[in-house]
Swiss-Prot record:
It comes from the Eukaryota. One of its GO terms (cellular component) is cytoplasm. The gene is mde1. The keyword Nucleotidyltransferase does not apply. Its EC number is 4.2.1.109. This is Methylthioribulose-1-phosphate dehydratase. Binds 1 zinc ion per subunit.
Amino acid sequence: MSQGLQQQNNDHLVQSDDPEHPANLIPELCRKFYNWGWVTGTGGGTSIRRGEHIFIAPSGVQKELMQPHNIFVLQYPTPKYPPSERKYIRKPLDLKPSACTPLFLAAFERGAGCCIHTHSQWAVLVTLLVEREKGPEGCFEISNIEQIKGIPKGPGKGMLGYFDTLRIPIIDNTAFEEDLTGSLEKAMDAYPDTYAVLVRRHGIYVWGDNVAKAKTQCESLDYLFQLAVEMHKLGIPWVK
């Protein structure tokens, strides 16, 4: 390995005894998400922004086996496109950057501290149900369910209440992950209070101000999606 490559690798950025360090948190989160069935077959991804650094899980690594030394680090801010212009300050030499990177960056540009992408079966199923019931332009809506309180109303607006209606936009899938970026950003603009975007037949992107908020919001949404699927089986409407 050349001296230049060694210098570029900046291993110190992912070496820490602090369990709250992003390089330690991302593998821990990925193991949890794998055990929950959200990120099978190396799918999905997680990214955390800390100050001027963005830490991103790599592509193609089994989520339950991920280690801190697998993590990519970007200087922030950094261009979304073209990929060659992104300011990587640590690149594991034997791994590929996540195809989710430009979508994570779109969330960080809106103030997020963490963004999670899962392939949850419940998320996929609700996109199919919405498409069948409302057509391709429909969004997911649900109300009068206690767990809705786990989702924010919007930046600086507090949390949704029991009687509020949660709305999550849905975008069409594409052949390549990076090509979702434009549609994701349009959905963010059309739904400025949303903290999540569903991808039809694919999964969901969820972001939050910090790791804890992104994780708990993702958990709350997955609960609501599963509940919605079961409600649909029983003929119970999602919005009361």
